[in-house]
Curated annotation (Swiss-Prot):
Domain Reverse transcriptase: 49-333
Disulfide cysteine pairs (residue numbers): none
Keyword terms, alphabetized: Mitochondrion
Entry's Gene Ontology BP terms: mRNA processing
InterPro entries per UniProt: DNA/RNA_pol_sf, Domain_X, RT_dom
Native source species: Marchantia polymorpha
Lineage: Eukaryota, Viridiplantae, Streptophyta, Embryophyta, Marchantiophyta
Cellular component annotations (GO), alphabetically ordered: mitochondrion
Cellular compartments annotated: Mitochondrion
Domain of life per record: Eukaryota
Protein known as: Uncharacterized mitochondrial protein ymf40
Length: 502
């Protein structure tokens, strides 16, 4: 097992690596509450910080508190550390992550190496037979993490008291809000700190372990169902009529209809599955609704008693996947319900289509809503010009529209209904035409006549300089999950979990 100790913090090389990583991100060059930037970060500066860490005189500075609007109209609190503190936090992350990462479970996907929303959704894709889905929503998760509990979880693997003391210095650094100092109340992991994703995963790792116990407790061994004798009887009747020379077409159709009304299996067992991405999680249940209700109650009790967290009652839903859809990581989840008999024979008999296969679909109404907020269309999806882009040059305008499309296309590459992105292409195409028309002082008909619906702009040699390069078709690739992390759904649109990394 990888171990960590305070002495690792005193290596100037790890500070250099942390600095190189942080300076590559423009947002990290912004000053914190102390107005300091990374521009003056030098070898002498590193040596000074290392000396302070060595004699334990180092103190974190208060983070600058900012508030950004959430989708529900409320404000989300961010804590922006000074660039110096970002570097120290990055060094701490590099020391702590190798210790905790091997302990995290396969059910956890948020803010982890080689994991992404796609790895979480790929796991759910395999949940064939799931009847119910519990959509989890923890009330104010990041604001309600108990630091005494979190320190205890860290101390299970980190035995160096100086590292734990440095953690408490970070916690107690507090904030500066509009020039006024605010003490830390010892609850909440501020979003915006480098360590926030790792700390939040350490905290909810306890929930992951609890869910492993729930899975073992409620997942039965053996087959989950047995053949329904009533269905078998109806099926045999249907095939006899098909083979009979005396049966009328009406009799055959009626027998087939009666057969397809029935389920071919009777549920005899249960199965529980679970996936988490940051503070967003879902539980898949194969079994009766009563089992899903029982699990939800046990989850609520565990979170309250062991982690001092509460479920958001109105947002924690139990969804019947055969009748409705659950929303997780910007994706609608349901199961196939179509019943039909395939003509091919398997083992001397006819094979029936598999029911309960997971469908992952695009929440097209949400996407249109985001395009409406962007100004590309109205609430009904009718395209219009994005007036704030009129002052860009034509190439920049086209690049803006293509970037929006690529974000959605790369994220939803796995969707069962990826053809719905053709509606997004339509909106973006004609919004772009309207925007270019406004810029050039032309009507849309003249823009289309001059440049085509792809807005093809050529240079003086007649080479294509700019073009809307939308695909003409969108083939369905259900298992087309990205190996590298795609855009986080928080960037595409505001889901229920908050952006926590700076």
């Amino acid at each position: 097992m990888t171990k960590c100790n305070y002495e690792q913090l005193l290596d100037p090389e790890i500070f250099r690596l942390a600095y190189e990583l942080k300076k590559s991100k423009s947002g990290n060059m912004k000053p914190g509450a102390d107005k300091e930037t990374l521009d003056g970060f030098s070898q002498a500066y590193v040596e000074k910080v290392v000396r302070q860490l060595k004699d334990e005189s180092f103190q974190f500075r208060p983070s600058r508190r900012e508030f950004i609007p959430k989708a529900d109209g409320k404000l989300r609190s961010l804590g922006i550390p000074s660039p110096r503190d970002k570097i120290v936090q990055e060094v701490m992350r590099r020391i702590l992550e190798p210790v905790f990462e091997p302990r995290f479970l396969d059910s956890s996907h948020g803010f982890r190496p080689h994991r992404s929303p796609h790895t979480a959704l790929r796991q759910i894709r395999r949940w064939t037979g799931t009847s119910w889905m519990i959509e989890g929503d923890i009330k104010g998760y990041f604001d309600n993490i108990d630091h005494h509990l979190l320190a205890g979880f860290i101390a299970e693997l980190v035995k160096d008291q100086r590292l734990l003391a440095l953690y408490w210095k970070l916690v107690r650094a507090g904030y500066v809000n509009q020039g006024k100092a605010e003490p830390h109340l010892l609850t909440g992991v501020p979003q915006g700190r480098i360590l926030s994703p790792l700390l939040s995963n350490i905290y909810l790792h306890q929930f992951d372990l609890f869910m492993e116990e729930i899975k073992v407790k409620y997942t039965t061994t053996g087959a989950l169902s047995k053949n329904n004798p009533i269905y078998l009887k109806a099926r045999n009747k249907y095939y006899k009529l098909v083979k009979s020379l005396k049966a009328s077409s009406a009799e055959i159709i009626r027998a087939r209809r009666d057969m397809l009304k029935m389920t071919y299996g009777i549920q005899t067992g249960s199965r529980v599955r679970y996936v988490r991405y940051a503070d967003d999680w879902v539980i898949g249940v194969t079994g009766p609704k009563a089992l899903a209700v029982q699990i939800k109650e046990e989850v609520s009790t565990f979170l309250q008693e062991k982690l001092k967290l509460s479920l958001q009652a109105e947002k924690t839903r139990i969804t019947n996947l055969s009748r409705s859809e659950a929303l997780f990581l910007g994706t609608l989840i349901s199961i196939t319900t179509r019943k039909y008999v395939q003509s091919q024979k398997v083992g001397g008999g006819h094979r029936r289509a598999s029911l309960g296969r997971i469908r992952l679909c695009i929440p097209i109404d949400i996407l249109i809503g985001k395009l409406s907020q962007m100004g590309a269309c109205d609430e009904k999806g009718t395209p219009k010009a994005v007036t704030k882009w009129i002052f860009l040059n034509v190439g920049e305008i086209i690049n803006k529209y293509m970037a929006v499309f690529r974000g959605y296309y790369n994220y939803y590459s796995f969707a069962d209904d990826i053809h719905h992105l053709l509606q997004i292409i339509y909106i973006l195409r004609y919004s772009a035409i309207n925007t270019v028309a406004r810029k050039l002082g032309l009507n849309t008909a003249k823009v289309i006549k001059r440049f085509g619906v792809d807005l093809i702009f050529r240079d003086h040699t007649n080479e294509i300089k700019h073009k809307l390069n939308f695909p003409r078709s969108l083939p369905n690739k259900r298992m087309n999950f990205a190996l590298s992390p795609p855009s986080d759904p928080r960037v595409l649109f505001d889901t229920s979990c908050a952006r926590i990394q700076c």
